[in-house]
């Protein structure tokens, strides 16, 4: 997928209640460069807890939506998925970006509603746990897959989420240093 840089992304960045750090800006620019290239992105963002990896992911997901695609963010626990949901909703709601949460504790009826919305592209960004890789989760037009705490998922689990789109760009985040 070849994305285009969108001016509206700058509006989202300007609306943040803080300025991006130099490291966040550099990471974001590198990821965006990957996204606008002809090649599929498969990138790791590594940083300490609290270093701002999540805001980079939020902006990457927003760029996907601004280009007409959907985004997915998979977290290893329901608590973390809910935190991401609240963070993304707070940041992106003023920009008419629809975000839904898919986790194990939803009722059957709630899950069915979310699944229908994601399939019909009424949901722009879906956040959840392993529930995202269930067979019944069908995206209309998945452009970016973000996996938080990637070391908590198996290789097959991460790969399965990316098969729900047509070669979506992949961003994985970790606070755990990767041994060389």
Feature-to-residue mapping (PLM):
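Post-DEXD/H (motif II) to motif III coupling segment of the RecA-like Helicase ATP-binding lobe
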Residues: 82-85, 139-180
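Conserved RecA-like ASCE P-loop NTPase motor core of nucleic-acid helicases/translocases
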Residues: 70-77, 102
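Conserved motor-coupling elements within RecA-like helicase/translocase cores
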Residues: 105-126, 133-142
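Pre-Walker A segment
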Residues: 1-51, 55-72
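Loop/turn-to-beta-strand initiation segments
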Residues: 68-72, 98, 121-125, 141-144, ...
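Conserved helix-turn-beta segment of the N-terminal RecA-like "Helicase ATP-binding" lobe
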Residues: 80-117
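Conserved hydrophobic/aromatic pocket- or pore-lining residues that grip, position, or stack substrates
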Residues: 24, 49, 77, 127, ...
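Hydrophobic residues in beta-strands of the RecA-like P-loop NTPase core, especially within AAA+ ATPase
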Residues: 46, 128, 146-147
């Amino acid at each position: 997928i070849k994305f285009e840089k969108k001016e509206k992304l700058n509006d989202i960045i300007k609306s943040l209640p803080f300025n991006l750090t130099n490291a966040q800006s550099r990471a974001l620019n590198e990821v965006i460069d990957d996204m606008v290239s002809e090649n599929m992105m498969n990138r790791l963002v590594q940083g300490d807890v609290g270093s701002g990896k999540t805001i980079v992911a939020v902006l990457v997901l927003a760029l996907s939506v601004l280009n007409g695609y959907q985004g997915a963010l998979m977290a290893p626990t329901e608590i973390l998925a809910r935190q991401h949901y609240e963070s993304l909703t707070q940041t992106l709601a003023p920009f008419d970006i629809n975000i839904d949460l898919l986790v194990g504790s939803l009722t059957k009826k709630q899950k069915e509603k979310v699944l229908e919305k994601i399939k019909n592209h009424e949901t722009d960004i879906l956040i959840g746990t392993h529930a995202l890789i269930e067979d019944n989760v069908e995206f209309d037009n998945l452009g970016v897959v973000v996996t938080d705490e990637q070391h908590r998922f198996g290789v097959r689990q991460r790969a399965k989420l990316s098969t729900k789109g047509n070669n979506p760009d992949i961003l994985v985040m970790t606070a755990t240093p990767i041994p060389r």
